[in-house]
Amino acid sequence: MIKLSYSTFGLTNMSFLDAIDVVDKAGYSGIELSFHRDQFNPFNITEEDIANVKRKLQTAQVKAACVATASHFFTPSRPHEPSLMSLDLAGRKRRINLVKRGIEVARKLGVSLVTFGSGFIRDEHVMNPSVNPRELLMDSIHECLKEIRGDEDITLLIEPEPGMFIETIEQGMSLVDEINSPRFRLHLDMCHMYCSERDYIAALGKAAPYTRYLHVSDAQQGCNLKIVKMADDLAFDLNFANYLVYFPDTADYLLIDGDHPMYFYDDPVPPQRQTQIERILGGVNIQKTAAHVDYNRLYAGATPLDNEIFTYLISVPGLSYDVLERAKPIIAYLRGTKNADGKPFMDKMAANTLTGIVHYHEIPGEGTMDFAASFNALAENAFSGYASVELYHHVQSWEKALDDSFRHLSRYV
């Protein structure tokens, strides 16, 4: 049986106890208790806080479905960092400690599931190829599992996520098999599956036996744009995505787009770079000359697109945050500037996924996901548990998100 739940990560503009109340009143069976630096911070939680949460849950109809240890927890501008596979042991231990605190809170509240994410390959991994990130991740998971006592019914879950080291269900299932513990399983996010699996319906069915918990949100097609560092062996597939190539010697960027190639610069472009640009574009049969755009003239302030662009940029692996931050005004320019036809150069949200579906959590019913087929695939493959709506992009419109999600998803579960 699949039961609907709602994550407090989408209700962070109120007190934690109030969040439990509104989910309860909305009719959900469960609630995900998500760590948050300002709302439910495990480093600040007192025994009195735990007692108050426990008392609230005992008097409500809603049940605690899972403790989420909040990938975004530590540094707002650099979410997911440090991760369980950070090269610096101090960083890994910070994340391990957070997951262990999740297990401790779950123990005190009688919750049986605790979830986390793998983290991303970052520039530190690229610059240290002798270090195996999978080994670091596995060592960290084993360390977290030590926190679970032999007589406890607590399971640790990993959530595959677009762009992360563990991104697809195949990667997730392989990791579960290799960890080889009955206390370690999968947490599937249906939006992530839509982004990362060519046949997400079949993938849901295949992964169901490994899965103890679900996240739910909607999503839709975007403009797939890959940011990559310039290298001689780069290969481009314009049927899959457009590319924004970063040149480390000048910190310039080349947009490889068949309709409107562009070169973003802030110093005069030397002849050898112009020749290189032409060679790259010619290699993918782009005959148009790249427009030169002065980076220093790009608007770099706040825009209504900030949330969308931030979500996109933090999902790009293998590059430093400085490279990604420097790309932000470029993405804003492409999304907000109109071409000769009166349309934005990038007329859909930016995606960095395996399918072109945007990793942006939409309210169920406002995207293009097939929820009927998705839930059928899970049920037919014996999944039973909570499906928690996670809408952290809709905190300001939480009432609509809470009610519309329940109304739409109740048709299918």
Explain the meaning of each model-derived region.
Residues 7-11, 34-36, 69-72, 119-121, ...:
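Active-site beta-loop-alpha junctions enriched in small/polar residues
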Residues 20-26, 45-68, 104-110, 145-151, ...:
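Acidic (Asp/Glu)-rich catalytic clusters
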Residues 6, 23, 31, 57, ...:
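Conserved, mostly hydrophobic/aromatic
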Residues 2-8, 31-33, 64-69, 114-116, ...:
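Hydrophobic faces of well-ordered beta-strands that scaffold small-molecule active sites
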Residues 17-36:
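Catalytic domains of carbohydrate-active enzymes, especially glycoside hydrolases
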